[in-house]
Amino acid sequence: MRPSFPLLLIMLLVCTAHHMVSGENAQSCTPEQQKTCKQYSCINPCCENNQCRCGCGILEGESK
C-alpha cells in the first residue's frame, strides 16, 4: 500500500499552518538565505534561528 500524495500534501499544509498560528519564526528568511535553502533537497525548506533547515520542527516531532 503506497502512501497517497494528497494525504502527504494535506499533512504538510497542516504543519505549515500550525507554525504560522504558533507564531514561530520558521519562515523568517532573508532573500540570501532563501537562495541557500533552495540548494538543499528539502520538501519544505525554511529558516530557523538564521539557519536553513528541512521542515523546521516538523521532522523533530513538533516538540520544543
UniProtKB/Swiss-Prot annotation:
Q: Where in the cell is it found?
A: Secreted
Primary localization class, coarse = secreted
Name the keywords, alphabetized.
Answer: Disulfide bond, Secreted, Signal, Toxin
PTM field: Contains 4 disulfide bonds.
Disulfide topology: none
Give start-end of the signal peptide.
1-23
Identify the GO cellular component terms for this protein. Answer: extracellular region
GO MF terms on file? Answer: toxin activity
In which tissues has expression of this protein been reported?
Expressed by the venom gland.
What family name appears in the similarity comment?
A: Belongs to the scoloptoxin-14 family.
Protein name, per record: U-scoloptoxin(14)-Er1a
- Organism of this sequence: Ethmostigmus rubripes (Giant centipede)
